């Protein structure tokens, strides 16, 4: 059957299948080991089995945890195996959502709608998001199915549906929720400026979601995530939130395991490097295919502000600029595929008036699209060379995007060694000993360490963590780390640390 003769319903199923298969590939290649940094945290939450720990959690983004924990309880599958199934399902749902937007909002043909779904599935930024940001992917997936409902002429039936979807979004992820609010607000502003009918029903629809989101701002987001009862925190990071506002960051003062910049140039270099890595081959196509749409353009604008505001106001910009930049893949993919379609149809020069200065011949358009797809393919399948290095990215991009999907917070080849280390600790620790836990192994500790033993979390300073252990009255302290430099993290082992257990490249050191 030719694609142009395919019905939209069958195209929708095919779009889901494409995303599912693409995301299943890295999971199969890494089997039975987990991939993704936060994946270990999700496994720990499934293993814990608790969805809401406090009444205020109803205002949090709890929905994905509720789904995963319910599935875990029903299936009794190993958490890592369950996540290897859920990750492709979420990605397939996302590519189906991309198809849904192309179909219902932009009225694109089935072939073009399938093209944007497949193109998105193989984008480096999309795969990097799906590597471990399950909440992010889940929230964005629901947002995609919501976007076609954002219409000036929405009826009351659509208003009820939009209200329900809005609640799912705000319980899904914060950036997805802010994106929804920005799109509705943008439509309102344009309606006022153009003296058009004001979309009151859109505002009515999102009122419940706004209430939940405000509850998140007041009761959840300003406070650190609750830790396990057996955890102590050293608090040796500097989060640098101006005026105590959790959603802003002073990027020239921040010092965390994820973000630390020696100068404005270092910050600029990091932002520019990540943008080039993710979108250098996508932007020319997006320029050719740029089109105007009220809600969609405001979404793209919001994500651009989140990505680059740190360069304009480095002392007070939206936090997690790297996450905002990864999210840019959603609108940019639509613009890029529209550009590729124009080039394919011989209309490369029929671009938006705003970008009339840019020209793209067919060969360049095809080459750019193929290169971006190849990068995505390498990213999801290439193994670590010597258990250390992938092929994607360079020095200051690794904090935001790994060099390959074939890893978690530790290289795949070190997964068994990590589990062995915690099994050894569970049989050799006593009530008078503690475990010093670097951020790298925090989620592994949540998952594997017996809760009768105390863990002291730190981000940068092992010596200060050791002092805290002494102050707390512990007679001995252990530390899990590599017994050789793998070039991933800045923390270096002191030569006087004594290894008491080795499993491959992972060792348990006795610090005191």
What does each model-found stretch correspond to?
Residues 427, 469-472, 492:
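Structural motif
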Residues 1-398, 433, 437-438, 445, ...:
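Membrane-embedded transmembrane-helix bundle of lipid-linked glycan/lipid transferases
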Residues 375-462, 476-484, 509:
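Short periplasmic/luminal acceptor-recognition loop of GT-C membrane glycosyltransferases, typified by
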Residues 461-469:
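Alpha-helical scaffolding within the catalytic cores
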Residues 488-490:
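Extended non-globular interaction regions in eukaryotic gene-expression and organellar proteins
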